Curated annotation (Swiss-Prot):
This is Envelope glycoprotein gp160. Keywords: AIDS, Apoptosis, Clathrin-mediated endocytosis of virus by host, Cleavage on pair of basic residues, Coiled coil, Disulfide bond, Fusion of virus membrane with host endosomal membrane, Fusion of virus membrane with host membrane, Glycoprotein, Host cell membrane, Host endosome, Host membrane, Host-virus interaction, Lipoprotein, Membrane, Palmitate, Signal, Transmembrane, Transmembrane helix, Viral attachment to host cell, Viral envelope protein, Viral immunoevasion, Viral penetration into host cytoplasm, Virion, Virus endocytosis by host, Virus entry into host cell. Inhibitors targeting HIV-1 viral envelope proteins are used as antiretroviral drugs. Attachment of virions to the cell surface via non-specific interactions and CD4 binding can be blocked by inhibitors that include cyanovirin-N, cyclotriazadisulfonamide analogs, PRO 2000, TNX 355 and PRO 542. In addition, BMS 806 can block CD4-induced conformational changes. Env interactions with the coreceptor molecules can be targeted by CCR5 antagonists including SCH-D, maraviroc (UK 427857) and aplaviroc (GW 873140), and the CXCR4 antagonist AMD 070. It comes from Simian immunodeficiency virus (isolate MB66) (SIV-cpz). Residues 36-701 are extracellular. Residues 1-35 form the signal peptide.
């Protein structure tokens, strides 16, 4: 009866009311869930992070050129890109630090490797570390006479030539004992050495006249000397440093950038400009120029730091060594030949460098002005002065450069003497004297020396001064002056002067951000790999755009991501194919392989993460991971319309690992759900139910059901026994007859048959396993049926009550709205009536007041007008 009553009550709900309830519940659910956001994966976002990676070089080297730089570059570098691309990054500010730039360290290692290969030693000069018996050598003139070797440098033009004596070059003729081809025999040989390459033994004085003195080679007691196989020219060629795929080079284009700080004009490039690895001290040679003289200093208050001054115009430096000499080979042991000077014709060590005085004076003024502007905040009113190098090795106290294969050591003190520079003379050029040494202390390592064989003939080279290296001496507070002196020796500063505008960054194409889209369904689809090509630099072009604008170009950015790998692979393969007879697994070969493998590994790692998250082949991938508001307090609009991807990456970088783990767990759960869903597909066809492969499974299920029923029967029996024992009665067996009540309309038995005392009868329990199982299964099904029916009725009754409650609420809401509308109409009418009454009253009062004012004015006017009449009437009466 209750069920029928419930069904009748359910029918009272009309279809219109049910639809209305459903809409109300849906609106409530939408209102509740509209603020939820979900993690969305983006592939191809313009995000980068600072990194240190292995760069590779590119150059236009020609393998057929025997010059050592060409040979090295042809083996170590790939070809340059004929169409280099540079992309401006708008609205991007990046921090640069030239003194913490790993690119400088990499270039330093590479140039050390270049020098080790270029100045490759062949003969150890340990046999020459013997006592040398030397006497002063006389130079041979053209007419055959001999005289002291004095260098006279001609300056000025031909009409006003001045011969300036720079000094006397001491050349010694030394004899020593050398081992012959037979190790047990020695012979005495001689060779010419220059004073700078010798050092006297203890207690010996330099030779005078025809007297002899004992010497040994310079650095024989401190370094391991070797002799180069052949004289090399060491003419540097431009080398470009390039970032491997997956990385990029950021370049600062600010005009006032001084090496450290924020840069607002940033661009991205694949390779640097061509850098000539010129080894020199005091001056930067053959580098790049700036728009104005720029001072690069790490810390203006630190006197120990080297100051790099970049020029805005070049100063031409012309270096020459005239004369001629004769070279001979001296055997110093089995298969060892020392190449020395046999004789000298002319002033063979007449070495000097010249530069234009006007150009140098103007440049010097600009340098002084730039230093004043840079250090005025630190030095105050102190005057900046200049002076010569304060001391140290010859490579530091002199301008050390390579000219035509010879090592020049030039005295530059005259260039920093303001009294000479600003003195107006007729000389057009400034000449600085130079020395040439053949035993040279190598700059790349401590305790290494090399003997370079002399070169015949005249040597001339032209270099461009593009920068100066200074050291700030301690300030003289008494004289209120600060002195700057030229310095050098740390070749990293030479490379830093060219690389200070660059930095290496690692591209991070994977990004996560909150959106309102959620992954709803679980389905399988055919996924295609994203095609990638073109140039990868455009990938960072949208770095300054907001996240919403940048996400619209993800397709193009993702296509550009892998192109760097493809282009680099093809370039390297072409280089290997063209130079396979030269390219071996050297240091640079290992670096190239590292760069290639690293790029591919990073790309595969990103693709692996996308696969773990179920986003393979997708540029924008929604997920079912809810966005946690604790990760950021930014609103949806602030994130997508006010922030760039770089800013967003810094905002959530601390939670990236957490988000990645949640994405992986969500995808694992989704795959499990998908697997279970697919396993149910085999039951979609009825024919599959009778598949022979399922019979064993059916048998297993049957055995489980039977075992369960038996176990259930045993449990119920035990429970029944326990229950009856607790009641004080225990049945004799499970086959005890149960009395059953007889129907009322059935007649009783006759007396002969024993009769029955009442209308009850006994029925025996079922016997047999199948009957018992069937009875239990029937009872179980009936039990489940009754329970499910009751549950359904309860649910229907609940829905009915909820519907009635909602309808009552809607009716009451409608009545409340009608009542509110009536109230508003009533009070609106009352307010309208009151306003009209107020306006009428005000109008009447104003009208009455106006009439009174007009009447008073009229009376007052008439009184004034009647004054003459009253006067006349008064006079008339008086006269009468």
């Amino acid at each position: 009866m209750k069920a029928m009553e419930t069904q009748r009550n359910c029918r009272t709900l009309s279809l219109k009311e049910i639809i209305l309830c459903t809409l109300v519940l849906g609106i409530i659910g939408i209102i509740k869930c509209e603020d939820n956001m979900w993690v969305t994966v983006y592939y191809g976002v313009p995000v980068w992070r600072e990194a240190d990676t292995t760069l590779f070089c590119a150059s236009d080297a020609k393998a057929q050129n025997p010059e050592v730089h060409n040979v090295w570059a042809s083996q170590a570098c790939v070809s340059t890109n004929p169409n280099p691309e540079e992309i401006e990054l708008t609205n991007v500010t990046e921090y640069f630090n030239a003194w913490e730039n790993n690119m400088v360290e990499q270039m330093h290692e590479d140039i050390v490797n270049l020098w080790d290969q270029s100045v490759k030693p062949c003969v150890k000069l340990i046999p020459l570390c013997v006592t040398l018996n030397c006497s002063l050598f006389k130079c041979i003139k053209e007419n055959g006479n001999t005289t002291n070797c004095t260098v006279q440098i001609s300056t000025g033009n031909d009409s006003t030539a001045n011969n300036i004596t720079v000094g006397t070059i001491d050349m010694y003729n030394c004899s020593f004992n050398a081992t012959t081809e037979l190790r047990d025999r020695k012979k005495q040989v001689y060779s010419l050495f220059y004073r700078q390459d010798l050092e006297p033994l203890e207690g010996n004085k330099p030779p005078e006249g025809d007297k002899n003195a004992l010497y040994r080679l310079y650095n024989c007691n401190t370094t391991a000397m070797t002799q180069a196989c052949s004289k090399v020219s060491l003419e540097p060629i431009p080398i470009h440093y390039c970032a491997p795929a997956g990385f990029a080079l950021l370049k600062c284009n600010d005009k006032n950038f001084t090496g450290i700080g924020q840069c607002k004009n940033v661009s991205t490039v694949h390779c640097t400009h061509g850098i000539r690895p010129v080894v020199s001290t005091q001056f930067l040679l053959n580098g790049t120029l700036e728009e104005k003289v720029t001072v690069l200093d790490r810390n203006v208050s630190n006197d120990m730091d080297t100051i790099i001054v970049k020029l805005n115009e070049t100063v031409r430096l012309n270096c020459t060594r005239t004369g001629n000499n004769t070279i001979k080979g001296i055997p110093i042991g089995p298969s060892q030949i020392f190449y020395g000077i046999e004789t000298v014709i002319g002033d063979t060590r007449q070495a000097f460098c010249q530069l234009n005085k006007t150009v140098w004076t103007n440049t010097f003024k600009k340098v002084r002005h730039a230093l004043n502007e840079t250090y005025k905040g630190y030095l105050g009113n102190e005057t900046i002065t200049f002076g010569p190098s304060t001391g140290g090795d010859l490579e530091v106290t002199n301008l050390h450069l390579i000219c035509g294969g010879e090592f020049f050591y030039c005295n530059t003190s005259i260039l920093f003497n303001t009294s000479i520079i600003f003195n107006e003379t007729k000389d057009d050029n400034i000449t600085i004297p130079c020395r040439i040494r053949q035993i040279v202390r190598l700059w790349q390592r401590v305790g290494r020396g090399i003997f370079l064989p002399p070169i015949r003939g005249t040597i001339n080279c032209i270099s461009n001064i593009t920068g100066i290296l200074f050291a700030q001496q301690k300030t003289d507070r008494m004289n209120k002056s600060a002195m700057f002196t030229p310095v050098g020796g740390e070749m990293r500063n030479n490379w830093r002067s060219e690389l200070y505008k660059y930095k290496v960054v690692r591209i991070e194409p994977l990004g996560v951000a909150p959106t309102k889209a959620k992954r709803r369904t679980v389905h399988r689809e055919k996924r295609a790999a994203v095609g990638l090509g073109a140039l990868f630099l455009g990938f960072l072009g949208a770095a300054g755009s907001t996240m919403g604008a940048a996400s619209l170009t993800l397709t193009v950015q993702a296509r550009q991501l892998l192109s760097g790998i493809v282009q680099q692979q093809s370039n390297l393969l072409r280089a290997i194919e063209a130079q396979q007879h030269l390219l071996q697994l050297s240091v640079w070969g290992i670096k190239q392989l590292q760069a290639r493998v690293l790029a591919v590994e990073r790309y595969l790692k990103d693709q692996q993460l996308l696969g773990l998250w179920g986003c393979s082949g997708k540029l924008i991938c929604t997920t079912s991971v809810p966005w946690n508001t604790t990760w950021t307090n930014k609103s949806y609009d602030d994130i997508w319309y006010n922030m760039t991807w770089m800013q967003w990456d810094k905002e959530v970088s601390n939670y990236t690992d957490v988000i990645y783990n949640l994405l992986e767990k969500a995808q694992t759960q989704q795959e499990n759900n998908e697997k279970e869903l697919l396993e149910l597909d085999k039951w979609a066809s009825l024919w599959n139910w009778f598949d022979i492969t399922s019979w064993l499974w059916y048998i297993k299920i049957f055995i489980i059901i039977v075992g369960g029923l038996i176990g259930l029967r045993i449990v119920f029996a035990l429970l029944s026994i326990v229950n009856r024992v607790r009641q004080g009665y225990s049945p004799l067996s499970f086959q005890t007859l149960i009395p059953a009540r007889r129907d009322r309309d059935r007649p009783e038995e006759i007396e002969e048959g024993g009769g029955e005392p009442d209308n009850v009868r006994s029925i025996r329990l079922v016997s047999g396993f199948l009957a018992l199982a069937w009875n239990d299964l029937r009872d179980l099904c009936l039990f489940l049926y009754h329970r499910l029916r009751d549950l359904l009725l309860i649910v229907l009754r609940t829905l009915e009550l909820v519907g009635q409650t909602l309808l009552k609420g809607l009716r009451r809401g409608r009545e409340a709205l009608i009542h509110l509308r009536g109230i508003l109409q009533y009070w609106g009418q009352e307010l309208k009536t009151s306003a009209i009454s107020l306006l009428d009253t005000t109008a009447i009062a104003v009208a009455e007041g106006t009439d009174r004012i007009i009447e008073i004015a009229q009376r007052f006017g008439r009184g004034i007008l009647n004054i003459p009449r009253r006067i006349r009437q008064g006079l008339e009466r008086a006269l009468l």
